[in-house]
Amino acid sequence: MIDSEAHEKRPPILTSSKQDISPHITNVGEMKHYLCGCCAAFNNVAITYPIQKVLFRQQLYGIKTRDAVLQLRRDGFRNLYRGILPPLMQKTTTLALMFGLYEDLSCLLRKHVRAPEFATHGVAAVLAGTAEAIFTPLERVQTLLQNHKHHDKFTNTYQAFKALKCHGIGEYYRGLVPILFRNGLSNVLFFGLRGPIKEHLPTATTHSAHLVNDFIGGGLLGAMLGFLCFPINVVKTRLQSQIGGEFQSFPKVFQKIWLERDRKLINLFRGAHLNYHRSLISWGIINATYEFLLKFI
């Protein structure tokens, strides 16, 4: 990966974080990047899931943070982690693909395509994001389980999948277009900016300092991308909250939401501040965990 200091064997004493940022792509087929991505995702979901539920309510209904928290309190602690299985399955799988495929595809493209490095890395990031979208059904079911309007229709992941089955396979992939756009955009920016951001952080001379830098760099980048992609996720959430019926286009749903929220940008970004903090924590955890595990695998 572009800035991964863990891709090279280190001497016992670390001298600088900036010396570890040079591009270094490993051989195709190494599973450590997939495994580290999977473990990083598990760690993140377990910690941040309650925050994600509050954010989901705000995206879906355009309500304030306090009202979303009150909704969750009324639902009770028993339902706080309701629906965690789909995001756990989805995130562990997609982040494994995100990191692993990016490494493999970058290696293949560099070997077989004569193009600038930034171009091959960009293409690898987009292709990895496209592959992640295969698991859209898990994100789809997660959306349904988090929506309290569907609490009386199904109580677990299996029932939610079963409820969609009668509508055909296309129903599992409702909201695919915004997911593809979000994945491609965020992957290109994440892998492209991770190295430069770390270069501008204070020089790290110990493993713990590297861990802090990885958390800060990943967190800042994740927060920025979370804010940038927030309107896309608002539309995606609205699309995936529907069961059956017409498959509406992205522009049509966006226009409908825009009108519902009084054509005000601030209303469209309602919940974005919480998303910013969640993304800051989530991607800090993901990036730091990923880089930490690479040192030991």
Swiss-Prot record:
Q: How does it sit in the membrane?
A: Multi-pass membrane protein
Q: Which GO terms describe its molecular function?
A: NAD transmembrane transporter activity
Mark the Solcar repeats by their residue spans.
28-108, 116-200, 209-296
An example GO BP is:
mitochondrial NAD transmembrane transport
* Cellular component terms (Gene Ontology): mitochondrial inner membrane; mitochondrion
User: Superkingdom of this entry's organism?
Assistant: Eukaryota
**Which InterPro entries does the record match to this protein?**
Mito_NAD+_Carrier, Mitochondrial_sb/sol_carrier, Mt_carrier_dom_sf
> Can you tell me where the transmembrane regions are?
34-51, 85-105, 118-138, 179-199, 215-235, 268-289
What are the entry keywords?
Membrane, Mitochondrion, Mitochondrion inner membrane, Repeat, Transmembrane, Transmembrane helix, Transport
**Catalytic function, reaction form:** NAD(+)(in) = NAD(+)(out)
Query: Where is this protein localized, as stated in its record?
Result: Mitochondrion inner membrane
Q: Which family does it belong to?
A: Belongs to the mitochondrial carrier (TC 2.A.29) family.
Outline what the protein does. Mitochondrial membrane carrier protein that mediates the import of NAD(+) into mitochondria. Compared to SLC25A51, SLC25A52-mediated transport is not essential for the import of NAD(+) in mitochondria. The transport mechanism, uniport or antiport, its electrogenicity and substrate selectivity, remain to be elucidated.
Q: What is this protein called?
A: Mitochondrial nicotinamide adenine dinucleotide transporter SLC25A52
Q: Which organism was this protein described from?
A: Homo sapiens
